[in-house]
């Protein structure tokens, strides 16, 4: 079981029980009138810390990316077509995506984006570990993080097929992801005090 990242059978059984609960929930909802007119959203709030090395590069275990890896499922067989996607997204993208699915006008005053709009420059998610001071960005190829309390930064592959970079390319990626992580961090801090509803 440890090969698949589970530390115990109890942990594995908790995952299996979650799947069972989703099934029972949907089976019950299918019997209700609202089912054909509802978008169900399932998302985890955190992943599992553990050895993910069987499936993912070292960063998933050593930099604890597995704790950030959660499922996201939009389910509405009468309203949306099935898709299987694997790009890097964030929990902050959920509300703008739902609003976009509803095809109603809305003002997005968050950092999130509509995942289905096709208007994406870059697939990325911000990470933060408050206690240790690490902020970072994971995208479809790399995980970059830096410590805001000390001069320390890391750039590691986030996928097995991550690109091989020259030193100049690596420096360019580091610089870009450093600027992006700082921009998101500072924007989120600003929004905390200034992004008030009317």
Task: Name each model-derived stretch.
Residues 1-198:
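Solvent-exposed soluble domains appended to multi-pass membrane proteins
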């Amino acid at each position: 079981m440890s090969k698949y990242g589970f530390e115990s059978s109890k942990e594995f059984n908790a995952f299996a029980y979650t799947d069972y609960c989703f099934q029972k929930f949907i089976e019950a909802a299918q019997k209700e009138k609202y089912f054909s007119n509802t978008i169900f959203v399932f998302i985890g709030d955190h992943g599992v810390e553990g050895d993910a090395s069987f499936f993912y590069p070292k960063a998933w275990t050593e930099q604890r990316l597995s704790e950030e890896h959660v499922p996201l499922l939009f389910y509405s067989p009468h309203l949306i077509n099935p898709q299987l996607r694997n790009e890097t997204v964030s929990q902050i993208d959920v509300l703008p995506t739902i609003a976009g699915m509803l095809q109603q006008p809305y003002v997005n005053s968050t950092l999130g984006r509509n995942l289905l709009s096709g208007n994406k420059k870059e697939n990325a998610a911000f990470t933060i570990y408050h206690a240790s001071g690490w902020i970072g960005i994971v995208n479809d190829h790399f995980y970059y993080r830096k410590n805001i309390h000390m001069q320390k930064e890391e750039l590691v592959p986030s996928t097995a097929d991550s690109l091989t970079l020259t030193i100049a390319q690596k420096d360019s990626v580091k610089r870009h992801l450093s600027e992006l992580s700082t921009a998101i961090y500072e924007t989120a801090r600003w929004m905390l005090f200034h992004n008030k509803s009317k």
